[in-house]
Amino acid sequence: MSEEIKKFDVVFECDAVNPGRMRTDMKVRMLEPDPFECELATDEMGFHGGDGSAPTPLMLFSGGLAACLMTQLRAFSKRLKVDVGEIKLATRLHWQGVQKGREPYETEPVSFEIDIDMEGSASTQQRIELIEAAKKGCFVEQTLMRPNIIGHRLKVGNDWVQV
């Protein structure tokens, strides 16, 4: 007896506006599987010319990684019937930037670390299997683990130019 294989799409869109300072206001829409829309904002701290009026983009990124993995841990603990009780997760994301004179800096990731603490009666092996399943189901972690091509276009008049 073969199990049914289901495929599903998860699709987001975001419209972002930056009126001239470091703050960016965004309307983020989940189109699939369950339509939902919210407004978010980012800003930079004073050292980068911002006002600190909202979380920095990397704060949202770090929180997004933590929340995505946490969601999968909780969802899969229920699906796999693994008793883990309360779950605590801590991330440490480290990048390094290099700048020559006044030129724009270039950045690269140095290390991303995630510490997970679970309560409950699950064995160590069950916890490891749960974490492995959650890693595979975490959209953010899977995106980070693969080479990705990100398309960029610039609007020029009424046309779009590939960058």
Name every feature range the model reports, one short phrase each.
Residues 1-63, 74-163:
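Extended beta-strand/beta-hairpin segments
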Residues 68-69:
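Alpha-helical metal-binding/catalytic segments enriched in His/Glu/Asp
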